[in-house]
Amino acid sequence: MEGVFLKMSVVGVSPMIPVGPSSFICAIGGSVEEKSTAASLPRWVSLRRLRPLEFLRIGGKREEKGTVRDDDAVLLERRDRNRNENDNGNWVLKILEVGSIWKGKRQRSGGGGGGEEDEEEEVAEPKKKEDLCEECDFCRIDDDDEDEEKEKTVFEFSEMLSKIPVEDAQMFAKLSFLGNLAYSIPKIKPENLLKYQKLRFVTSSIEKRMSLKVEENNNGEEDEEKKKLINPAVAYRIAASAASRLFSHSKSVLPFGSSKRQDNEEASLLATADSVTAVVAAKEEVKQAVADDLKSNRSPPCEWFVCDDDKSGTRFFFIQGSDSLASWQANLLFEPVPFEDLDVLVHRGIYEAAKGIYEQMLPEVHAHLNSRGKNRAFLRFSGHSLGGSLSLLVNLMLLIRGQVPASSLLPVITFGSPCIMCGGDRLLQKLGLPKSHLLGISMHRDIVPRAFSCNYPNRAAKLLKALNGNFRNHPCLNNQNVLYSPMGKLLILQPSERFSPPHPLLPPGSGLYLLASKNTDETEKSLRAAKILFFNSPHPLEILSDRRSYGSEGKIKRNHDMSSYLKALRHVIRKELKQMKAERDQWLRKFFIINILFSGRDSLKLITRFVASRSSQLVIIFFLPIRLLIMSVYSVVFHHSQAHFSFFK
C-alpha cells in the first residue's frame, strides 16, 4: 500500500454511486447466500449420562429424539439454488443503498452532518464512564489479560473446548432448519411442519400485516432505478479496496495473513466511500427519524414466524437476519445507547428495531401464557445474524418489563449473530440469569460475530470518537478496543475441510465445541482472553481485504449463510453417529471375547467333572456359552448362503 494517494475524484465510476467503507461494516447481519469423565466407558454409553447442555431441556426432561429430516417443511437446498442473488442479501449493494439514503437525509436536514464541532454542540456534557459502567471486570481487559492473550497457545485454547453431545447437536440442527425457514415464510406448509417437525404453525409477521390491513411499502420500480446505478463488480471492488487500505495500516492487530498491494486507481475509489460515515456522523434528528422507521409496522427490519410444540408447551419465535433495506439501516446505526434505562450499553439500531418487534410479538406471548398457564408455558427465541440479536433483546425486554416470568424463558439460541452489548454478562447476573441463557453458535470463520468484538485499530477508534460523541465515553472501546463485548456462552462450529479450511485454534475435522471454563476468577480471565483470541483470528479486516470473500460464492456468504450452519451441523451429527457406532461395535467385540474366555474356562471345568464322574451322558454343546453357539450357527449359515449365491453367478 506504499504510494497510495487519496484522490477527491473517482476514475471510471459514475459520481451517482454513493458507497461506504466496508472496513467498518464487517458484513453485519446478512444472510448472503464438557469433556467426558467416564474414561472407562465407551462414548456411546457415557454420552447418554453426561449432559453439559442439560439446561436446554424443559423441566429436566429431554426433548423427542430424532435427527433432522431432509424432506422437511421446505426443501432448503432447492430454495438456495433458485434464490436470486438480489434476493439473498447482497450486503455490499445494501450498504451502498443505505449510504445514498442517509446522505440524502443529511442534505435535507440542512447540514453537512456531523463534524466534530457540530457533534460537540449537540451532545450534552457526557456522562462519566463510571455512571454507565461501574468498576467491574465485565468491560475491562487489563495489561495482564493482553499478555495472556498473546501468550495463549493452541493447546491452551483447546483445553477450554468441550464437544457438544449428539442429541444437543440434533436440537441445534432442528432450530437452524426452522431459522432457515424464516427466509421463506410464504413457502412454509403448515401440514409439512406438523408432520416432520411436530410443530404447529401459529402466525407470522406477514400474516400480522395482512390482518391489520397494512399495505407493505413496496417501491419496486424506484428500487430498480437505484440498483441500475450500482454495478456489483464496482461495489465489490470498492469494498475490497477500502478494507485493504485500512488493513495495511492495521497489521499489528492481525494474528495471521499479510497485506496486499493495491494500485493508485483502485485506492482512489475510497474517496466516495462515505456510507458508514454518513450514518455515524448524522445529526440526531436524522437518526431519530430512522429509529422511528425501524419501530414501525409498515416496514419491519426482519420477518419472523411463530410455531408451537404442543407436547412440551413451548412456543418458538424465529427471526430472520438482514434481508431488507430497513435491516441494513439498523445494522449501520451502531452507536451505543443505554438499554432499558440500565447501566448497560447496547447497539442503537438493533435496539430500536427490537422495540418494534417486541410490540408485534407481545400479543402472541400473552396468548400462549394465558392458554397454557405461566407454570406450563415456555418461550424459545432464536434467530440468525441480526435476527439472533433481536431475539436476545426481545427476550430480555419481556423479563425486564415484567411481562414474562424468568421460569418461562428458555435459553436464547443464535446463529452467526454479532455481539451488541457492553456489559451483557453483568446484566444477566443482575437479572438472576446464568450465562447459559444465551447460546451463541458461531461458524469458525464467520465474519459477523467478529464484527463488533474484534480489536479496532486506534485510527478507527479515534475516527469514531471524532464523528460521534457517544463513542468518546464508550467503556468497551476505551478499555478493550472493541465496540461490544461477548456475552453468554460461545459455541464454535467447524464444518468439514471440503466446505471451508479448518481454523488454526480448533482440532482438525468437523465438530461443535463449547468454549467454557470453571467458575473461578482466574479461569474467567482466561476465558475472556480466549474469546478475544478467537474473534481476532482471523481479523475481519483480513477477511475483507481478500477478494475471494466477495460475491455469491465468496467466503463471507459461505461462512455466514444460514443454510451453511444447517449443513455443517448435519455433517457433524452424521460424523458423530458414525463414530459412536464404530466405538460401540468395537466395545461389543471386546466384551464378547472376554465373556467367551471366562465362560469357556468354567464350561471346560464342568465338562471334565461330569466326564470323570460318569454320572450322565451329556452333550458338550450345552456347556458352551450361548453367544458362541449363536455366532457359530450364524457363521455356518452365512458360509452356505455365500456358496449358494456364488453358485448362481
From Swiss-Prot:
<keyword id="KW-0150">Chloroplast</keyword>
<feature type="active site" description="Acyl-ester intermediate">
    <location>
        <position position="385"/>
    </location>
</feature>
<feature type="active site" description="Charge relay system">
    <location>
        <position position="560"/>
    </location>
</feature>
<keyword id="KW-0934">Plastid</keyword>
<dbReference type="GO" id="GO:0002213">
    <property type="term" value="P:defense response to insect"/>
</dbReference>
<dbReference type="GO" id="GO:0047714">
    <property type="term" value="F:galactolipase activity"/>
</dbReference>
<keyword id="KW-0378">Hydrolase</keyword>
<keyword id="KW-0443">Lipid metabolism</keyword>
<keyword id="KW-0442">Lipid degradation</keyword>
<feature type="short sequence motif" description="GXSXG">
    <location>
        <begin position="383"/>
        <end position="387"/>
    </location>
</feature>
<dbReference type="InterPro" id="IPR002921">
    <property type="entry name" value="Fungal_lipase-type"/>
</dbReference>
<comment type="function">
    <text>Sn-1-specific phospholipase A1 that catalyzes the initial step of oxylipins and jasmonate (JA) biosynthesis. Hydrolyzes polyunsaturated acyl groups preferentially from chloroplastic phosphatidylglycerol (PG). May function downstream of abscisic acid (ABA), and provide a link between ABA-mediated abiotic stress responses and oxylipin and JA signalings. In vitro, possesses broad substrate specificity.</text>
</comment>
<dbReference type="GO" id="GO:0016042">
    <property type="term" value="P:lipid catabolic process"/>
</dbReference>
<dbReference type="GO" id="GO:0031349">
    <property type="term" value="P:positive regulation of defense response"/>
</dbReference>
<keyword id="KW-0472">Membrane</keyword>
<keyword id="KW-0809">Transit peptide</keyword>
<feature type="active site" description="Charge relay system">
    <location>
        <position position="446"/>
    </location>
</feature>
<dbReference type="InterPro" id="IPR029058">
    <property type="entry name" value="AB_hydrolase_fold"/>
</dbReference>
<dbReference type="InterPro" id="IPR043367">
    <property type="entry name" value="PLIP1/2/3"/>
</dbReference>
<dbReference type="Pfam" id="PF01764">
    <property type="entry name" value="Lipase_3"/>
</dbReference>
<comment type="similarity">
    <text>Belongs to the AB hydrolase superfamily. Lipase family.</text>
</comment>
<dbReference type="GO" id="GO:0008970">
    <property type="term" value="F:phospholipase A1 activity"/>
</dbReference>
<feature type="region of interest" description="Disordered">
    <location>
        <begin position="104"/>
        <end position="128"/>
    </location>
</feature>
<dbReference type="GO" id="GO:0009507">
    <property type="term" value="C:chloroplast"/>
</dbReference>
<protein>
    <recommendedName>
        <fullName>Phospholipase A1 PLIP3, chloroplastic</fullName>
        <ecNumber>3.1.1.32</ecNumber>
        <ecNumber>3.1.1.26</ecNumber>
    </recommendedName>
</protein>
<dbReference type="GO" id="GO:0031969">
    <property type="term" value="C:chloroplast membrane"/>
</dbReference>
<feature type="transit peptide" description="Chloroplast">
    <location>
        <begin position="1"/>
        <end position="26"/>
    </location>
</feature>
